[in-house]
Amino acid sequence: MPSDWDDDEGMPEMRPERPARRRGPSRGQIMRRRLVALGSIVVVVVAVIIVLSSSGGDDGSGRPTAHPSQAKKVAHKTKAKKAASGKVTNATPQADWVPHRGPVPILEYHDLGSPPEGEPYPELFVGRDDFAKQMDWLEERGYEAVTLEQVQEAWYHGGKLPPKPIVLSFDDGYRPQFTFALPTLKEHGWAGVLNLKAEGSDLYESNVKAMIAAGWELAAHTIHHLDLTELGPEEVEEEVAGSRKILQREYDVPVDNFCYPSGQFDEAVVKAVEEAGYTGATTEISGFAERGKPFELARLEILRETHVGGLAADLKNEEGETAEGGG
């Protein structure tokens, strides 16, 4: 026994052996593995191409077309994306917009929902389901909502509009125009025109600002919503010019269009509107708005009993008359 061992300590501690190093694959093995992996990727890509090409049709142009069910899914996703973004897609001209100098339909809405008991004008309350269905119907038929300012830019300054433009106007400033019309139009990527009376509306200042931020146009509807044809010259000027000044001061945006309360106007009222600096004015004359009548712009009033069928008939009738008249 070696002399340096100690009986009390026993045998000296032995260090564990290190595991043996594994020998790495050779260069040839590495190359073979890479080739196998590459081959697998190619097979997967080819399979995906075959599946995609077989799922679509052909529209005669050599481009695959989506199955109808796929098209609906894409449309639904696009609509949801517009709503989530909160952005208005028609705020600026799109690639398919074209010069337009012909008539344009302007729809006229008031309140949305069920009329309260004792309401003197229940016909002005369009059901919310009806309103949503009308917006869906318009989009399905290719209509795109724009503001009146955009129409005037196309009419008088060489601007462009969608192939089937339409203006959605909302009078007076009812609360559901903010709580329901605003989000509904957002789903379609559209904006409306708010014809706001300067005093006495149901909308808060923050509501109006939110609508403007979403791309809506702000138009004047007098201060107190009075019949202008029954007022004297000074009162007319106060209601017409004064409402524009109030709205521009409160919301810091251009207010270039006017809406006659209850559609009432005469030569003196029209003159006051022109002198106040407005570009145009909407009426309750039934029909399409025409470029040659900037201060007598016709509209299609949508009432509680209009529904989708009535809207479709109104648009079809007016389009037919426009075509017959050489539009």
Question: In which residue ranges do the predicted regions lie?
Answer:
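Non-cysteine beta-strand/loop elements that form the S-adenosyl-L-methionine
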Residues: L107, W216-H221
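Core hydrophobic alpha-helical transmembrane segments of single-pass membrane proteins
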Residues: L38-V48
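Short beta-strand and adjacent tight-turn residues that come in two discontinuous sequence segments
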Residues: N195, H221, A281-T283
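C-terminal active-site subregion of NodB/CE4 polysaccharide deacetylases
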Residues: H67-K73, K77, K81-S169, Y174-F180, ...
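C-terminal region of N-terminal signal peptides and the immediate post-cleavage residues
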Residues: V48-Q70
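Terminal targeting segments of Actinobacterial cell-envelope proteins
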Residues: M1-R33
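A short, conserved beta-to-alpha structural element at the edge of catalytic cores
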Residues: G189-K209
